[in-house]
């Protein structure tokens, strides 16, 4: 089975668009309590949005591709920070490099543009053939990216943008998310669970374009469904949350005693959020589908009750190398690739991650076969 999936099927897009439109038509005035009929309509629409993303995305085949011309080429994978999700993608990229014959070098920043820019300049100086930027917005290090273009380096933008966003200057390809529909589904999950009476706090890094966009999409969908439901957005310090977030959560739940939900969009933050919520009944939503978080959901040892799961993190590393390899030789169809995702909760978390992504059981072989190796 294939690992490359098209998440944004036309019927699915039409469904979500029609649901969101219906939500807007049925809104009460902001600040007013919902009537019985309005609440029923809200819950019905919320369930439709939620369920639209619960199912496993459709599979499409990876096009055959001759990897041999890329043997010995150098690709640098630069992550914004050394957090578990990025590390697992990097591990996958290293494994794909060994399988493909591409020399993959991993570099982590500290969450700042300075370290990311320094890494890009180092890669350029050392003659890299390709550079993949994970959670590093190319526009924030534009001078360094411009230098890569002059040097003929293939640069890919990884999980910084959503479907259809324009490609930044100096970038050859991007690995994007279907973030608008994902956030509509997550807002639907909260409203279906709360019967459209939610009080939600969201932590999202404003410094990352994809999470900044996600917070806007979630806010819009949430308020379309329930304009009178309380919602607060707080900036997450992506480079320092391991030291600061637990105390921040403790402060926030004292400040907001009626809080029902926390949506911490960076999956790596879950242990910190859980620690801050010890003994509390606040429900947590997150993103990224990290294996530890999904397993904790199964064992009921976390406050997380819904997670937007990517395909296995290591497989995204293989996708990064695959995209780079195709772009390095000018192959078609690799300029924008959508990262597969699925809304996971108790209805579909199953006994193991293999049950969430059955098509990924042997994804490594799928790649090597498509590469002719």
Name every feature range the model reports, one short phrase each.
Residues 116, 173-199, 212-213, 245-246, ...:
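Hydrophobic alpha-helical segments within soluble ligand-binding/sensing domains
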Residues 24, 29-73, 312-373:
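Hinge/cleft segment of the Venus flytrap/periplasmic-binding protein
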Residues 139, 143-181, 291-303:
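Flexible loop/hinge segments that line or gate small-molecule binding clefts
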Residues 133-150, 218, 238-296:
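Hydrophobic alpha-helical
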Residues 98-110, 172-173, 199-202, 219-243:
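Short beta-strand elements in bilobed, periplasmic/extracellular small-molecule ligand-binding domains
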Residues 74-75, 79, 93, 182-226, ...:
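An alpha-beta-alpha
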Residues 29-92, 96, 100, 105-117, ...:
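Extracytoplasmic "Venus flytrap"
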Residues 18-22:
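C-terminal motif of bacterial Sec signal peptides marking the signal peptidase cleavage site
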């Amino acid at each position: 089975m294939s690992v490359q999936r098209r998440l944004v099927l036309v019927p699915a897009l039409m469904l979500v668009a029609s649901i969101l439109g219906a939500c807007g038509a049925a809104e009460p005035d902001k600040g007013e309590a919902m009537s019985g009929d309005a609440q029923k309509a809200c819950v019905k629409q919320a369930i439709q949005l939620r369920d639209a993303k619960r199912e496993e995305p459709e599979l499409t085949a990876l096009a055959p591709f001759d990897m041999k011309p890329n043997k010995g080429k150098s690709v640098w994978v630069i992550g914004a920070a050394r957090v578990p999700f990025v590390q697992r993608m990097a591990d996958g990229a290293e494994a794909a490099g060994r399988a493909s014959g591409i020399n993959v070098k991993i570099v982590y920043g500290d969450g700042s543009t300075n370290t990311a820019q320094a890494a890009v300049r180092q890669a350029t100086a050392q003659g890299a053939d390709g550079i993949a930027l994970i959670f590093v917005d190319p526009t924030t290090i534009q001078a360094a990216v411009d230098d890569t273009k002059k040097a003929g380096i293939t640069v890919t933008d990884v999980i910084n943008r959503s479907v259809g966003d324009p490609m930044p200057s100096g970038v050859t390809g991007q690995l994007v998310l279907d973030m608008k529909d994902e956030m509509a589904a997550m807002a639907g999950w909260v409203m279906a669970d709360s019967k459209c009476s939610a009080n939600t706090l969201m932590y999202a890094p404003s410094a990352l374009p994809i999470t900044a966009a996600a917070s806007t999409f979630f806010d819009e969908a949430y308020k379309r469904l329930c304009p009178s439901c309380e919602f607060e957005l707080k900036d997450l310090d992506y480079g320092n949350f391991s030291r600061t977030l637990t105390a921040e959560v403790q402060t926030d739940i004292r400040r907001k005693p009626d809080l029902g939900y926390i949506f911490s969009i960076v999956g790596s933050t879950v242990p910190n959020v859980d620690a801050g919520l010890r003994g509390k009944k606040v429900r947590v939503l997150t993103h990224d589908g990290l294996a530890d978080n999904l397993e904790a959901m199964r064992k009921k040892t976390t406050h997380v009750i819904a997670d937007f799961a990517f395909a296995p993190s290591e497989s995204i590393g293989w996708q990064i190398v695959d995209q780079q390899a195709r772009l390095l030789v000018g192959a078609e169809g690799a300029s924008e690739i959508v990262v597969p995702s699925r809304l996971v909760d108790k209805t579909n978390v199953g006994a193991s991650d293999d049950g969430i992504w059955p098509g990924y059981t042997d994804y490594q072989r799928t790649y090597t076969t498509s590469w002719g190796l």
